[in-house]
Amino acid sequence: MQRLPRTVPLKQAMGMMLTGRRVGAQEGLKLGFVTAMVPHAKLMEEARRWAGLILECSPMSVRATKQAVMRSLDATSLQEAMNNLSYPAYAAMAKGEDAIEGPKAFAEKRKPDWKGR
């Protein structure tokens, strides 16, 4: 309940929450809380595509992003969320081997070899 008004326009969020109205996938896509819509037969293919895209990223970067996003949802304002620098996963990522590997791979025009450390 606390997250929906941060995801979709307030009036739409209130309408859904106060009435319990069900929202279909197409409307969810339009409102922005559905990422993609595919036929049922293509569901696993699309899920694997998304997983592949995520797996191409540094595991430490994915972890830090998830931590920052989830913790920022608890902030009372955008400013508070932006000022909160106490994300342990981000600090670990910034000091890790992958922080060196990413720019190095980019400069060498090759795919990074993420170590997750």
Describe each model-derived feature in a short phrase.
Residues 9, 39-40, 95:
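Helix-capping/helix-break motifs at membrane-protein junctions
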